[in-house]
Amino acid sequence: MKAIDELNLPEDVRYTDDHEWAKQNGDAVRIGISDYAQDQLGDIVFVELPEVGDSFDKGEEFGTVESVKAVSELYMPMGGEVTAINDALADEPERVNSDPYDGGWMIEIKANDAAELEALKSKADYLEMLKG
């Protein structure tokens, strides 16, 4: 397990208490799990994602991630409609471990309310939470 100061936590990403991240990507918002989350889970072997066109409210479960240690639910950091899923994760779920913010992103959404993104934690706030 990584020490808190070894975590890869980009500045341009917003974080949730449940360790998901969200980032503006053109007109869409890209969502995945943080480096902390993938590190805690260990080797990821399967990711279950929703279908394009599915809509979710903030805080609603949108999928699961399965590792050699556990199965964890994925929660929406903000409400919206799924516009894309990362199909590469079906064959290469380990991308979430090796590259949680780029190759390991999970879904993209058309956000219901853009203000929900800014309401999420900054890197500094997320680090503060992790340090307890």
Across the structure, where does each feature detected by a protein language model lie?
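Charged, well-structured alpha/beta interaction segments
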Residues: 57-73
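Charged, amphipathic alpha-helical coiled-coil/dimerization segments
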Residues: 79, 83-84, 90-97
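ATP/adenylate-binding site constellation spanning eukaryotic-like Ser/Thr protein kinases
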Residues: 76-79, 123
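Acidic, low-complexity mobile loops and tails
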Residues: 1-61, 94, 98-117, 123-132
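Residue-level recognition of beta-strand microenvironments
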Residues: 22-24, 68, 85-88
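Short glycine-rich, polar/acidic loop-and-turn segments at beta strand-coil junctions
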Residues: 35-37, 69, 78
